[in-house]
Every structure is written in C-alpha cells, then in structure tokens.
Amino acid sequence: FLPLLAASFACTVTKKC
C-alpha cells in the first residue's frame, strides 16, 4: 500500500480532503 494511495482512500472514506 502506497502512502499516496492510503491518503486517497482515507479521503474517499472520510470525505475529508
């Protein structure tokens, strides 16, 4: 899991970008 991918996933799930 890449850090950038993890950040993108977190953004999608929490709706906090």
From Swiss-Prot:
User: According to its UniProt record, where is this protein mainly located?
Assistant: secreted
The record's comment on protein family reads: Belongs to the frog skin active peptide (FSAP) family. Brevinin subfamily.
Q: What does this protein do?
A: Antimicrobial peptide.
Taxonomically, which superkingdom?
Answer: Eukaryota
From what organism does this protein derive? Rana arvalis (Moor frog)
Could you say which tissues express the protein in this record?
A: Expressed by the skin glands.
Any one cellular-component term (Gene Ontology): extracellular region
Question: Which cysteine-cysteine pairs are annotated as disulfide bonds in the entry?
Answer: 11-17
Keyword terms of this UniProt record: Amphibian defense peptide, Antibiotic, Antimicrobial, Disulfide bond, Secreted
Task: Show the coiled coil region(s).
Answer: none
Q: Where in the cell is it found?
A: Secreted
Tell me the protein's name: Brevinin-1AVa
Kindly list the biological process annotations in GO that this record carries. Answer: defense response to bacterium
